[in-house]
Regions:
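HIT superfamily nucleotide-processing domains
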Residues: 2-149
Length: 149
């Protein structure tokens, strides 16, 4: 029994590292420190969302468009963005955000995930895990979500 103690220690260490995520913690702390620079750089350059061709759009309203996320985290993973660029949800008028939510609900019904359940996510600033400074909402569904996704 004693000869297997290293396996136990390795499993415990892997669990602790996975839970604490020190690399992610350091990354987001650095990102938070650089927030003004990140925002300035983001405003100075077009975001990847601004080059999505119209043929890839899966939904549209007067002020918002939707398209499939290329890095899917669920069977249904759609991004909804305002046509006019806002860095974060804090910068956008409430009526634009409401229109984005309305488009997300319409798409959830079209994708038949309205009854089984879906998630709407808006990441804001570094601690909110925002990496692209163009307001965008994730519509996620088609699988059982965990409480911490």
């Amino acid at each position: 029994m004693l000869k297997y103690w290293r396996i136990g220690v390795a499993v415990l260490a892997a669990f602790v590292i996975g839970q604490l995520n020190p690399i992610g913690f350091v990354y987001w702390k650095l990102a938070e420190w650089r927030l003004p620079q990140i925002r300035a750089e983001s405003l100075a350059h077009p975001t990847p969302f601004e080059s999505i061709p119209r043929a890839k759009w899966v939904g549209e309203t007067a002020n918002a468009i939707a398209f499939n996320d290329i890095n899917r985290n669920a069977p249904v993973h759609i991004l909804i963005i305002p046509k006019k660029r806002y860095n974060t949800v804090l910068d956008a008028p409430p009526e634009i955000v409401a229109e984005m939510v309305g488009l997300a609900v319409k798409l959830a019904r079209e994708k038949h995930i309205d009854q089984s359940g879906f998630r709407l996510v808006i990441n804001t600033n570094p601690q909110g895990a925002q990496t692209v400074y163009h307001l965008h909402m994730h519509l996620l569904g088609g699988r059982q979500m965990r409480s911490y996704d």
